[in-house]
Amino acid sequence: MKMKLVTAAVMGLAMSTAMAATDATSLATDKDKLSYSIGADLGKNFKNQGIDVNPEAMAKGMQDAMSGAQLALTEQQMKDVLNKFQKDLMAKRTAEFNKKADENKVKGEAFLTENKNKPGVVVLPSGLQYKVINSGNGVKPGKSDTVTVEYTGRLIDGTVFDSTEKTGKPATFQVSQVIPGWTEALQLMPAGSTWEIYVPSGLAYGPRSVGGPIGPNETLIFKIHLISVKKSS
């Protein structure tokens, strides 16, 4: 994290210099256009991350360093400033993450409390909920068996985060190699069945951030069609 932030800061100095020295209406050379494009891209990233900097001061620092002029801050002062910046940014990110995790947990619990009273919804001791859409008559898989499924995963607000429809082909995997909510549900499903399962965060990814739309402590919904089961030898 530290090296990434330092690298970003150094790049920022270079890019803001290029932007300050180049009028956006007179990008005559490829070098001008490249410099401007990289600077604009970095500026967007800084804005999206909430990093507040002074472009003029960044440009001045780069110019002084490249020209060999006396720097306005000592090496130790600059190191201290960057270290504080990194520490403050990490604290901010952690606070934002924890707030989001708490919000998702509360929303997920409220959803499950309401959902369990809906017609056809079954609640298991683990907290996993499911509803049978179509009941198959095939074999039920065990933990070590391999299954082939079609599925769509979405958040409780309806956002689809994954689906076999995107790839156009079903997914095949061992029952024990997925999130606990899936492992539990699959072992109850006869092949040929289609279920909708409602997975509490503790049976999904928990407080971890897995990227994409799935945040920490997310309750997840999956529509699963169990196509086939291959028993382990």
Curated annotation (Swiss-Prot):
Annotated signal sequence range: 1-20
Chief location category: membrane
PROSITE patterns: FKBP_PPIASE
GO BP: protein folding
Annotated EC: 5.2.1.8
The PPIase FKBP-type domain, residue ranges: 144-233
Entry's Gene Ontology molecular function annotations: peptidyl-prolyl cis-trans isomerase activity
Cited InterPro entries: INFPOTNTIATR, PPIase_dom_sf, PPIase_FKBP_dom, PPIase_FKBP_N, PPIase_FKBP_N_sf
Reactions catalysed, as given in the entry: [protein]-peptidylproline (omega=180) = [protein]-peptidylproline (omega=0)
Superkingdom to which the source organism belongs: Bacteria
Family per record: Belongs to the FKBP-type PPIase family.
Biological function: Essential virulence factor associated with macrophage infectivity. Exhibits PPIase activity.
Name of the molecule in the record: Outer membrane protein MIP
Species this chain originates from: Legionella pneumophila subsp. pneumophila (strain Philadelphia 1 / ATCC 33152 / DSM 7513)
